[in-house]
Every structure is written in C-alpha cells, then in structure tokens.
Amino acid sequence: CMEPKKVGPCRAAMPRFYFNSASNKCEGFTYGGCDANHNNFQSEADCKKAC
C-alpha cells in the first residue's frame, strides 16, 4: 500500500484503485494493463480491505 501509483507502459485503459499515502485514501486511476506493482486493486473495497 505504500508503493506509488503505477500506470505501467501498456496502453489498455483498466479502471483500478490504489492507496494514496498522502491523502490516506483509496483513489481511482487508469491502469495500462501491464507492469503493475502491489498497490493496484480491482475495486475500492479490495483497496480498503488491504490498506
């Protein structure tokens, strides 16, 4: 949860969530589809549960 948001180099447009440690909230972003880190969740609920 402390890793930065990582969009990745691919060009897909997948809606995902990450934990923003600055705001202390799970926030949405558009994921490119490859080269993710561990701060990448399919739903806001999954993000909140993990972080």
From Swiss-Prot:
Annotated Gene Ontology cellular component terms: extracellular space; nematocyst
Q: Which cellular compartments is it found in? A: Secreted; Nematocyst
Q: Name one GO molecular function term.
A: serine-type endopeptidase inhibitor activity
Which cysteines link up through disulfide bonds? Answer: 1-51, 10-34, 26-47
The membrane spanning regions, by residue number, are: none
UniProtKB keywords: Disulfide bond, Nematocyst, Neurotoxin, Protease inhibitor, Secreted, Serine protease inhibitor, Toxin
One Pfam assignment? Kunitz_BPTI
Read off the InterPro entries from this record. Answer: Kunitz_BPTI, Kunitz_BPTI_sf, Prtase_inh_Kunz-CS, TFPI/VKTCI-like
Secretion signal, residue range per the UniProt entry: none
| Family designation | Belongs to the venom Kunitz-type family. Sea anemone type 2 potassium channel toxin subfamily.
- UniProt function note: Weak serine protease inhibitor that has been tested on both trypsin and elastase. May also act as a neurotoxin by inhibiting voltage-gated potassium channels (Kv). In vivo, is lethal to zebrafish larvae.
Protein name as annotated? Kunitz-like toxin PcKuz1
